[in-house]
Swiss-Prot record:
Protein name as annotated: GMP synthase [glutamine-hydrolyzing]
Catalytic activity: XMP + L-glutamine + ATP + H2O = GMP + L-glutamate + AMP + diphosphate + 2 H(+)
InterPro entries referenced in this protein's UniProt entry, alphabetically: Class_I_gatase-like, GATASE, GMP_synth_C, GMP_synth_GATase, GMP_synthase, GMPS_ATP_PPase_dom, NAD/GMP_synthase, Rossmann-like_a/b/a_fold
Alphabetical list of HAMAP family matching this protein: GMP_synthase (MF_00344)
EC id: 6.3.5.2
GO molecular function, one term: ATP binding
Source species of the chain: Streptococcus thermophilus (strain CNRZ 1066)
SUPFAM superfamilies from the UniProt entry: Adenine nucleotide alpha hydrolases-like (SSF52402), Class I glutamine amidotransferase-like (SSF52317), GMP synthetase C-terminal dimerisation domain (SSF54810)
Domain Glutamine amidotransferase type-1: 19-212
Annotated Gene Ontology cellular component terms: cytosol
Keyword ATP-binding among UniProt keywords: yes
Assembly mode: Homodimer.
Keyword set, alphabetical order: ATP-binding, Glutamine amidotransferase, GMP biosynthesis, Ligase, Nucleotide-binding, Purine biosynthesis
């Protein structure tokens, strides 16, 4: 019989926690707004633009931010807002579309920017025309990122002009009596030089934030929530060996002790030596009760001949839970399945206002007939926050700073059909890459690095013979939260050493390429 997903007590409903909610209008940057607010020690998360005033009252936020978005406020299908929210007495900051929505709903005027002749995309110089608490401590002229196709031409009654730009006569406005603020630019992106200062001013000066949100708070609350949800029942956790599932394991162990059973599924798609490392690290050092299952043949048989990346993810997600079903049937009274789903996983799998980037192994890969209720203790956290949580839980750096590894494992680092030969090329080349990055002292500077079998064969020469072997790609990126990333500028001598070692030590490889694509437009993983 199918069971529903467990909805863990949401942090945003806890009245003793200050929070600022971000209403989602579909901007590619909206998750960064919540991330920036959290950096200040204030809890923040995205909520649907369809949220009602009663639901906002229940959350009791100290502030509301209306995100940007691609739509026009005057379109028939425009995303709106429950106008009773304006009567709650809560400070509101409208960003880009959010400013236009405030204007439109409160009696101002918004028109297509082409009609007003002030369409703006890219960096622009903002000019302050009045003193404002929102802009306190920032210069009269400052560089901001504009990205709007519509424009405010008349501000609502009660508002006054705060700033403009060459092409935007109303770039910022405010109604200090109601504590409503609107800005036409994006403060959440790094291209807006004083963006953090502006968001800090909103959070602290206008909303009255104390900045007392921390991982210690999160640990205490999550342990309490887990105990309340689980009671005296049992939880099954799938360990992958990655940071996320390891942190979930230690958190659950602290919360419910021996009510937790961990299953480590060796699906035949792990990195070199990973299986033994998981058992030694989490079973030995942390005392987790771990059942190791060798299911490699089951997975590889199902993946034979499959080259579509989403099908790979679905197959692995389905089989992963089926293995759990098989193992759980040997145990008594297991009701819950725990996962290391992160906030970024949920965002990348799409919201009602944004397109799905790709199905995620922790979100879209679960079968409809899943036989467990689902617990996701990390699903409000970004990657760097998970590392901070691991440190707060007393986990050593070698665990906390371990390279991120996707649930589908090496399956999504092999383009096309998965074969034993391709698996071996990725395992061995990845081990060399990790070893050389560590030797160069770059393992804490580079956020993530791995190798990919591109599925492409090319002509080469080794010794006196012609070869026709695989091309291996190196992917190395720098990032803060995983939502955006730049390719890592690794020293040429390090790249050269890695390349020489791989082509000499790994069979069936004769060419190495370096991926110099940022995110966006690419994702971190190749599939």
């Amino acid at each position: 019989m199918q069971k529903e997903r467990v909805i863990m007590t949401n942090i945003s409903t806890l009245n003793d926690v200050q929070k600022i909610i971000v209403l989602d209008y579909g901007s590619q940057y909206n998750q960064l707004i919540a991330r920036r607010i959290r950096e200040f020690g204030v809890f923040s998360e995205l909520k649907s633009h369809k949220i009602t005033a009663d639901e906002v009252r229940a959350i009791n936020p100290i502030g509301i931010i209306l995100s940007g978005g691609p739509n026009s406020v005057y379109a028939e299908d425009a995303f709106g807002i429950d106008e009773e929210i304006f009567e709650l007495g809560i400070p509101i900051l409208g960003i880009c579309y959010g400013m236009q929505l405030l204007t439109h709903k409160l009696g101002g005027k918004v028109v297509p920017a082409g009609e007003a002749g002030n369409r703006e995309y890219g960096q622009s110089t903002l000019r302050l025309r009045a003193q404002s608490e929102l802009f306190a401590g920032t210069p009269e002229e400052q560089v901001v990122l504009m990205s709007h196709g519509d424009a405010v031409t008349e501000i609502p009654e009660g508002f006054h002009l705060v700033a403009d730009s060459v092409d935007c006569p109303f770039a910022a406005m405010e109604d200090t009596k109601k504590n409503f603020y609107g800005i036409q630019f994006h403060p959440e992106v790094r291209h807006t030089v004083y963006g953090n200062d502006i968001l800090k001013n909103f959070a602290f000066s206008i909303c009255g934030a104390k900045g007392d949100w921390s991982m210690a708070n999160f640990v205490d609350m999550q342990i309490a929530q887990i105990r309340e949800t689980v009671g005296d029942r049992k939880v099954l956790l799938g360990l992958s060996g990655g940071v996320d599932s390891s942190v979930v394991g230690v958190l659950l162990q602290k919360a419910i002790g021996d009510q937790l059973t961990c299953i480590f599924v060796d699906h035949g798609l792990l990195r070199k030596g990973e299986g033994d490392q998981v058992m030694e690290m989490l079973g030995g050092k942390f005392g987790l009760n771990i059942i190791r299952v060798d299911a490699s043949k089951r997975f590889l048989d199902l993946l034979a001949g499959v080259d579509d990346p989403d099908k790979k993810r679905k197959i692995i997600g389905n089989e992963f839970v089926h293995v759990f079903d098989d193992e759980a049937s040997k145990l008594k009274g297991v009701d819950f399945l725990a996962q290391g789903t992160l906030y970024t996983d949920i965002i990348e799998s799409g919201t009602e206002t944004a397109q799905t980037i790709k199905s995620h192994h922790n979100v879209g890969g679960l079968p409809e007939d899943m036989q467990f209720e689902l617990i996701e203790p990390l699903n409000t956290l970004f990657k760097d926050e998970v590392r901070a949580l691991g440190t707060e839980l007393g986990m050593p750096d070698e665990v906390v700073w371990r390279q991120p590894f996707p649930g589908p494992g090496l399956a999504i680092r092999i383009m096309g059909e998965i074969t034993e030969e391709k698996l071996e090329t990725v395992r061995e080349s990845d081990a060399i890459l990790r070893e050389e990055i560590a030797k160069a002292g770059l393992d804490r500077d580079v956020w993530q690095y791995f190798t990919v079998n591109t599925g492409v064969r090319s002509v080469g020469v080794m010794g006196d013979g012609r070869t026709y072997d695989y091309t291996i790609a190196i992917r190395a990126i720098t990032s803060i939260d995983g939502m955006t990333a730049d390719f890592a500028k690794l020293p040429w001598e390090v790249l050269q050493k890695i390349s020489v070692r791989i082509v000499n030590e790994v069979d069936h490889v004769n060419r190495i390429v370096y991926d110099i694509t940022s995110k966006p437009p690419a994702t971190v993983e190749w599939e």
